[in-house]
C-alpha cells in the first residue's frame, strides 16, 4: 500500500474520530432553585411535568414541553460575570433570557404562589451543587402590575436579602433570613445568585401574595427529585471552579455519552489500524 493511500486512510479515520467526539452531547449545568417562596419552575415541576395541575403549568408544558420542568434547577447564564442587567432584557428576567424557559416570563396572575406578610422571612434554597458566591433577593415595588412583563425597574433597589453562599450546604439547602417590606397584593420575588468562583449566575421568580391565607404552593419532594433524575439533561461535573463533582444529584443518562463516544472512537481506530497493517503486508 502506498504511503499516499495510508495517509489518506488515516485522514479519514481522524475525521471520523473528530466527528464522533464533536457529536457527544455536553451536559448543561444546574445548581438549585428557590423552595421558599417556591419559584415558578419548581412549583410547576412539583405538580408533575407529565400531568401538571394548574392551568399555567399545563400551558407551560404545552408551549415548551416537559424538559424545562425536569431541568428545574438550571435557569442560568454561564458567562454572566456580574452583568445580569446588561444581558437580560426587560420582560425576560424570569427566564434569564433563555428561550428554553420562555414560559416563565408569562405575565399571569395564576402562577402558584406563597402567602407572605411584612417582616422577617425565612428563605429556603434547594442546592444541587453548592458554590461560593452571593445570592441577592429583590421584590417588586408597591404598585407593580403582575399582568405586565417584569422589568428591572419594577424591582425595589434595596434587596430584601443578601446571602453569602459557600461550597457546603446543610442538608442540601441554603437557609437564610430576609426582611419583606410592607406591600399589598401580588408581587414577584426575584433572585440572582452570582458565583465568585466562576462567571456563572442563576435566576428565579417566585410569586407571593401579601395577606393571602391560601395554602402555599408545594415545593418538589426529595423522593420526586430522585425518581425524576434520569429525565434531567443537567449535570455538575467540576465545571467553572468546582474542584470535585458534587454528589447531591444522581448523574443523568447524558453523563455516559462521552465514554461511549470515546469507546466508539477507540474501536474504529483499532479496526482501521488493523486494516492498514493487513493491506501493507499484502502489498
Placement of each model-derived feature along the sequence:
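Short, hydrophobic beta-strand segments
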Residues: 127, 174-183
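Exoplasmic/lumenal beta-rich domain surfaces
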Residues: 142-172, 238
